């Protein structure tokens, strides 16, 4: 049974899931808006909101914390210096998910996730 389980497995091993979320987060930070599957978007929202909250502090330790998750200098720098300061007065809710369409190949629901 999966009662009260904390996250979605997305049909992947833990290392594959970690790499997927890291790559989706980097893409979202670089492009400010991406289109992906609805369940990937919902998992990414949790992942990126925690990173954005940590990055709002803006000091060296925040840089280190975010870099430990992303392993990408450009994305880390952009999140800490450009994106996170915009949300200094906002307590969570930094992203928006909108269902868009169905994928033609397998009819799965797609959604766009973007920074508010």
Curated annotation (Swiss-Prot):
SUPFAM superfamilies: Prokaryotic ribosomal protein L17 (SSF64263). InterPro entries: Ribosomal_bL17, Ribosomal_bL17_CS, Ribosomal_bL17_sf. Signal peptide: none annotated. It comes from Helicobacter pylori (strain ATCC 700392 / 26695). This is Large ribosomal subunit protein bL17. The keyword Signal does not apply. Pfam families: Ribosomal_L17 (PF01196). NCBIfam families: L17. One of its GO terms (biological process) is translation. One of its GO terms (cellular component) is cytosolic large ribosomal subunit. The gene is rplQ. Keywords: Ribonucleoprotein, Ribosomal protein. Part of the 50S ribosomal subunit. Contacts protein L32. GO terms for molecular function: structural constituent of ribosome.
């Amino acid at each position: 049974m999966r009662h009260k389980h904390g996250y979605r497995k997305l049909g992947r091993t833990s290392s594959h899931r970690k790499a997927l979320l890291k790559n989706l987060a980097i893409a979202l930070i670089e492009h400010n808006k991406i289109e992906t599957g609805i369940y990937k978007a919902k998992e990414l929202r949790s992942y990126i909101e925690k990173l954005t909250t940590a990055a709002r502090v803006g000091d060296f330790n925040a840089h280190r914390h975010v870099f430990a998750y992303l392993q990408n200098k450009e994305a880390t720098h952009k999140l800490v210096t450009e994106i996170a300061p915009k949300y200094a007065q906002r307590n969570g809710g930094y992203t928006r998910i909108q269902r868009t369409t169905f994928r033609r190949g397998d009819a799965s629901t797609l959604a766009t996730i973007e920074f508010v």
